[in-house]
Amino acid sequence: MVTIRADEISNIIRERIEQYNREVKIVNTGTVLQVGDGIARIHGLDEVMAGELVEFEEGTIGIAPNSESNNVGVVLMGDGLMIQEGSSVKATGRIAQIPVSEAYLGRVINALAKPIDGRGEISASESRLIESPAPGIISRRSVYEPLQTGLIAIDSMIPIGRGQRELIIGDRQTGKTAVATDTILNQKGQNVICVYVAIGQKASSVAQVVTTFQERGAMEYTIVVAETADSPATLQYLAPYTGAALAEYFMYRERHTLIIYDDPSKQAQAYRQMSLLLRRPPGREAYPGDVFYLHSRLLERAAKSSSRLGEGSMTALPIVETQSGDVSAYIPTNVISITDGQIFLSADLFNAGIRPAINVGISVSRVGSAAQIKAMKQVAGKSKLELAQFAELEAFAQFASDLDKATQNQLARGQRLRELLKQSQSAPFTVEEQIVTIYTGANGYLDLLEIGQVKKFLVQLRTHLRTNKPQFQEIICSTRTFTEQAEALLKEAIQEQIELFLLQEQA
């Protein structure tokens, strides 16, 4: 027979009384009414904040952008296949945020900052809100430092400065992503952190970009944020904000960053899908009324910080695809009005073999020569005007049978100027090489050569200068000015190379 020991029972009761915690935990919960198409309708969650994260019973996380009188609309960050009608949901009390640290450099992550490159977890001690406010007027200063892309056509005529927002716009397959990736490759050794955000792209295209970065040693200073075409609309919508949060982390640490959004029109489509499923009223092209705010709050985060904040910068290059060159569509006009200029890529130029296919006539940088070193301003000042005049003259010359000598000379000069702007992909030029190239063309030294010889001659000239006149590069690097001494050295090198080149061609 079991004996009951009263002292043991009383000890257990005393222990339990001592351990008793009267703390009351309040949890804001709700019940799933309906789920499907990446959207859930929740009854309850009375005190949920706009944009608050909510957690479902089986672990899926969602964001609550819609609060209606009798339910809350939640967009799911996942497929939500295990969520059932009637299951419980609890509010987390947190707004969407991601971990941030230096360890993200060289990694490929998704919109939730989780690694997707199979190289293990990323350690981070800090976190940032995915949507944080843009710097105010006092926190900024005007753009004055150049961000070199390595592309002659851009750096000489449509210069981009650190802290600027420059749109890259054009039809599909015109080399928009190539311009952006070349700009990242050119940041090697420039102490610039790069973030490439792929929104709704094919997984194979993203893999190709990552492979290029790895082969060229660019991944060591680059973070790739990828949400491919098969990702849920919520994650495609969040990806650019995740990229911006990572770039801001470095900007506020007095570093220079470059962020590429490829492309915001896919983000707008994902946002349209979410909004229509949440039954928000549609507007133009079925986009919701706040689609302008979607992009403006993203692009306004790019800035050049004031001296008080350490002069860090975040330069944004959004890429927008047009349909048949129509830049007056809804999303292109929105982004054009937000950015500080646009680089327009033309399908006609691309098909004519002019690559990068930049239409210099209608491309513009609203920062202008403030984002160029003095040497580049001195050499490339008139190039854009000359090319625009040439394009006009070329169109006119098609209908004229006999042209005077001056017009023929201007056409010949323009053709050679256009030729020197051609560049192979993933082959960026240094500023010194660009100055050499433009000076040679703008001052008529290429007029002696046939158009087919221009590229070959310029390659040899740049090599000749590098090996035989290293002082030229030293002068440009140290003074950032095209001095008389530099000009004399360059003229001498051009004369030597022209004589040698013509002899080689005759032989």
Swiss-Prot record:
The record marks S363 as: Required for activity. One of its GO terms (molecular function) is proton-transporting ATP synthase activity, rotational mechanism. Its main location: plastid. It catalyses: ATP + H2O + 4 H(+)(in) = ADP + phosphate + 5 H(+)(out). It is a peripheral membrane protein. InterPro entries: ATP_synth_asu-like_sf (IPR023366), ATP_synth_asu_C (IPR000793), ATP_synth_asu_C_sf (IPR038376), ATP_synth_F1_a_nt-bd_dom (IPR033732), ATP_synth_F1_asu (IPR005294), ATPase_a/bsu_AS (IPR020003), ATPase_F1/V1/A1_a/bsu_N (IPR004100), ATPase_F1/V1/A1_a/bsu_N_sf (IPR036121). Keywords: ATP synthesis, ATP-binding, CF(1), Chloroplast, Hydrogen ion transport, Ion transport, Membrane, Nucleotide-binding, Plastid, Thylakoid, Translocase, Transport. GO terms for cellular component: chloroplast thylakoid membrane; proton-transporting ATP synthase complex. It comes from the Eukaryota. Its EC number is 7.1.2.2. Produces ATP from ADP in the presence of a proton gradient across the membrane. The alpha chain is a regulatory subunit. Belongs to the ATPase alpha/beta chains family. PANTHER family: ATP SYNTHASE SUBUNIT ALPHA, MITOCHONDRIAL (PTHR48082:SF2). F-type ATPases have 2 components, CF(1) - the catalytic core - and CF(0) - the membrane proton channel. CF(1) has five subunits: alpha(3), beta(3), gamma(1), delta(1), epsilon(1). CF(0) has four main subunits: a, b, b' and c. This is ATP synthase subunit alpha, chloroplastic. The lineage of its organism: Eukaryota, Viridiplantae, Streptophyta, Embryophyta, Tracheophyta. The gene is atpA.
